[in-house]
Amino acid sequence: MPVRASIEPLTWENAFFGVNSAIVRITSEAPLLTPDALAPWSRVQAKIAASNTGELDALQQLGFSLVEGEVDLALPVNNVSDSGAVVAQETDIPALRQLASAAFAQSRFRAPWYAPDASGRFYAQWIENAVRGTFDHQCLILRAASGDIRGYVSLRELNATDARIGLLAGRGAGAELMQTALNWAYARGKTTLRVATQMGNTAALKRYIQSGANVESTAYWLYR
């Protein structure tokens, strides 16, 4: 099947990664997607519903490769017990950057599509931005008795009813971090907490489902 899509430059990513990339937005009103239209870009991304096999086949015929599967989940917000988390401060940024860089080294920004250090740098910047309140609105952390950070979660208000987890990581701290996220959303009057993760991250999927989340959608990321 032919694919109709607009092509939009990924301005922030291009500046951050030093690449010339764009994303296709599939819509019936857009022109036909052709190799000539894709040629000016060194990297083109596409995100499609996993159930849409027609688009998947058509994009692969245009030279796109499957990079990653994504699962989006949602859970109802309830008032749960306090986890003891605190708001991260700017003095926590160096440690958080190091932790996020290591935890998220194998995202869709990995080699060979991007530089070997690109994924780590991207998520280090993400968690720093969360501490500063840009993009994600806040970062909360759990501390060990030593004072070291043993877990962190970044969160963002989407609208009057929904909040979304950005990054969540901490070995053995998943349940506490979910408590933290639910408390944060509850305090802001939200009714739904959303989170996305890689299809292959079964540990995260189990944690979210154990915390009450249901799968809302699945998608594939493809690159050319």
From Swiss-Prot:
One of its GO terms (molecular function) is N-acetyltransferase activity. Pathway: Bacterial outer membrane biogenesis; enterobacterial common antigen biosynthesis. InterPro entries: AcTrfase_WecD (IPR012752), Acyl_CoA_acyltransferase (IPR016181), Ankyrin_rpt (IPR002110), Bact_Acetyltransf (IPR050832), GNAT_dom (IPR000182). The active site is at 208 (proton donor). Its EC number is 2.3.1.210. Gene3D superfamilies: 3.40.630.30. It catalyses: dTDP-4-amino-4,6-dideoxy-alpha-D-galactose + acetyl-CoA = dTDP-4-acetamido-4,6-dideoxy-alpha-D-galactose + CoA + H(+). Residues 94-224 form the N-acetyltransferase domain. Keywords: Acyltransferase, Transferase. Acetyl-CoA binds at residues 168-174, 201, 207. Pfam families: Acetyltransf_1. It is an enzyme of class 2 (transferase). GO terms for biological process: enterobacterial common antigen biosynthetic process. Catalyzes the acetylation of dTDP-fucosamine (dTDP-4-amino-4,6-dideoxy-D-galactose) to dTDP-Fuc4NAc, which is utilized in the biosynthesis of the enterobacterial common antigen (ECA). Homodimer. NCBIfam families: PRK10975.1, wecD_rffC. Belongs to the WecD family. This is dTDP-fucosamine acetyltransferase. The gene is wecD.
